[in-house]
Amino acid sequence: MADVDVDVPSAAPVLDGAMDINTALQEVLKKSLIADGLVHGIHQACKALDKRQAVLCILAESFDEPNYKKLVTALCNEHQIPLIRVDSHKKLGEWSGLCKIDKEGKPRKVCGCSVVVIKDFGEETPALDVVKDHLRQNS
């Protein structure tokens, strides 16, 4: 029984070290949703960006309104807010909690989301460190 307790903590850092940006971003979005620091949708996101309340902005590339993309990008550039782009608005909606979870834990009825703004990261996690490292490398 003591061996099991020793193995579990040693396995956790290996998973965190191999964490890619998408997995880390998904965990950071969950933690900020729990901390009530997440804003969904173009209107609310633009208000948070303009008031400089945002810490991080995530924009979906599959969103088909180019003027909104330009607006969000311009607001992020103007206020020096980091911007991460993801490929699918359905994936972004799933990550930010805009879906139903069935009995098996799989997402159903996923609602797409064009942009998500994080106002509060919540608690510090290794996933947050991965996201911050990614932002430092790409800036």
UniProtKB/Swiss-Prot annotation:
It comes from the Eukaryota. Coiled coil: none annotated. GO terms for biological process: cytoplasmic translation; maintenance of translational fidelity; positive regulation of canonical Wnt signaling pathway; ribosomal small subunit biogenesis. It is found in: Nucleus, Nucleolus. Keywords: Nucleus, Ribonucleoprotein, Ribosomal protein. GO terms for cellular component: cytosolic ribosome; cytosolic small ribosomal subunit; nucleolus; small ribosomal subunit; small-subunit processome. Signal peptide: none annotated. The keyword Ribosomal protein applies. InterPro entries: Ribosomal_eL30-like_sf, Ribosomal_eL8/eL30/eS12/Gad45, Ribosomal_eS12, Ribosomal_eS12_CS. Subunit of the 40S ribosomal complex. Part of the small subunit (SSU) processome, first precursor of the small eukaryotic ribosomal subunit. During the assembly of the SSU processome in the nucleolus, many ribosome biogenesis factors, an RNA chaperone and ribosomal proteins associate with the nascent pre-rRNA and work in concert to generate RNA folding, modifications, rearrangements and cleavage as well as targeted degradation of pre-ribosomal RNA by the RNA exosome. Belongs to the eukaryotic ribosomal protein eS12 family. Subunit of the 40S ribosomal complex. Part of the small subunit (SSU) processome, composed of more than 70 proteins and the RNA chaperone small nucleolar RNA (snoRNA) U3. This is Small ribosomal subunit protein eS12. The gene is RpS12.
